[in-house]
From Swiss-Prot:
Gene3D superfamilies: Cystine-knot cytokines. One of its GO terms (molecular function) is hormone activity. SUPFAM superfamilies: Cystine-knot cytokines. This is Lutropin subunit beta.
Length: 141
């Protein structure tokens, strides 16, 4: 009987040991490449470009008794260090600024969501798309 209990315990624990040795099941917060769209209502086309954004899993906690205590702030994957780059929208009429600037993630961290610099709305059901005709490629400055 003792041997059977030991075998059962080994069977229950062995998958978790294998999973733990491979690291987390979800990728942790880090810079990843993403394709974004840029447009201006006064310019005739929309362009797509690739930049790095912060994405990934941040450990979080949910209270067991949510009604008794205030909610726990949930951390999000956000910028630690960033730089800015720019693209030029082609075909803009004179007097319209054709330059669109965007952040480039250099490093990321888990922390509170700052609405001034981040979109904290969660995953999108539809990717960002252009309203104007799309011009493939990019023109980095």
């Amino acid at each position: 009987m003792e041997r059977l209990q030991g075998l059962l315990l080994w069977l229950l624990l062995s998958p978790s040991v294998v999973w733990a040795s491979r690291g987390p099941l979800r990728p942790l917060c880090r810079p990843v490449n993403a394709t974004l769209a840029a447009e201006n209502e006064f310019c005739p086309v929309c362009i797509t470009f690739t930049t790095s954004i912060c994405a990934g899993y941040c450990p979080s906690m949910v209270r067991v008794l949510p009604a008794a205590l205030p909610p726990v702030p949930q951390p999000v994957c956000t910028y630690r260090e960033l730089a800015f780059a720019s693209v030029r929208l082609p075909g803009c009429p004179p007097g319209v600024d054709p330059i669109v600037s965007f952040p480039v993630a250099l490093s990321c961290r888990c922390g509170p969501c700052r609405l001034s610099s981040s979109d904290c709305g969660g995953p999108r059901t539809q990717p960002m798309a252009c309203d104007l005709p799309h011009l493939p490629g990019l023109l980095l400055l």
